[in-house]
Amino acid sequence: MPIFSALRLLFTMINYNNKVFVPLSNSENGEVDLSMRFVYQQTGNIVTSTYSGGRIRAGHLIALVDEQGNLDMRYHQVNDKGEITTGICKSTPEQLPNGKIRMHEKWQWTSGDQSEGESLLEEL
């Protein structure tokens, strides 16, 4: 990728750094609790977060963000049963009238039953 294109990518994408997201809804087969908080960190086009709460004792996500702010994510976590669970997620941002971001997520477990689900997160 030419340097100009790489710089343009960095300046046009959504900056998720230090944004805090809370779950609004989650599919029944998910482990995310509605009381959890996700604090995103971003360096370049890489987004990360550590999280815990509810049924999750410890979790980590890593994602690549594209020019439209979409996240291509992988996550792994330890649940309250002591199991390591893993998955993939595609997150699509929606800009709200108040300037905040709502994330529409479609995910799939890559461990266990391989089931799919959807979540909705919103920036605090």
PLM regions and their residue ranges:
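Edge beta-strand at a domain terminus
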Residues: 34-37, 108-124
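N-terminal glycine/threonine-rich, aromatic-flanked beta-hairpin/loop signature
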Residues: 37-64
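A short, polar/proline- and glycine-enriched secondary-structure boundary/capping micro-motif
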Residues: 58-62, 82-88, 112-118
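Short, solvent-exposed aromatic-acidic interface loops
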Residues: 52-58, 77-81, 106-113
